Regions:
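Catalytic core segments in nucleotide and nucleic-acid processing enzymes
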Residues: 4, 8, 12-166
Length: 166
């Protein structure tokens, strides 16, 4: 799905987590920064339309330089807290990546590097109220349309929702 599914899941989970209190804006995969308003793969805005958080999502192998580049973008946008989320099947040098994030954190730019599975577990655990598969499916489709996701990605979401009887 050319790296589209992970950002869609993250955007949908963030939307559910914030319950409308913040605006979650996913960007077309591999095009973050294409506009002066885009910082990460997913940007989060408060009700005053101020950027308050940004998330980089990697669903392919990455290096400490990728993490450093993301944190540098976040710093330039004056975002002090951010997330770098990686997919289930990616490879990276854990020590180097976490050390890089820690060093930049000491300079005031905090970026949590976390797996998609841990991110989803953490967010779902901290939400008050039930989240239904139906809500998640509708959000995935809504965000897929927003980023002009490939037809295969949209079909996969629809297939999964059919399998769950939605």
């Amino acid at each position: 799905f050319e790296g589209e599914m992970c950002p869609l899941v993250v955007a949908a989970i963030e939307h559910l987590y914030y319950k409308g209190g913040k605006t979650v804006v996913p960007h077309k995969v591999n095009e973050s920064g294409a506009s002066s308003k885009e910082v990460g793969d997913i940007d989060v805005f408060d009700n005053a339309e101020q950027l308050v958080s940004s998330i980089e999502v990697k669903d392919k192998d990455f290096t400490k330089e990728d993490v450093e580049h993301a944190i540098t973008k976040f710093a330039q946008a004056q975002i002090e807290k951010s997330l770098f989320i990686f997919g289930k099947h990616v490879n990276f040098e854990q020590h180097d990546v976490y050390e890089t994030a820690a060093e930049l954190g000491k300079k005031g730019y905090f970026c949590s590097v976390v797996s998609i599975m841990d991110f989803v577990r953490m967010r779902l655990y901290s939400m008050n109220g039930d989240v239904t598969i139906n809500q998640l499916a509708h959000l995935l489709l809504e965000y897929a349309r927003q980023i002009n996701a490939k037809d295969e990605t949209i079909e996969r979401i629809k297939t999964c929702t059919t399998e769950f009887g939605l």
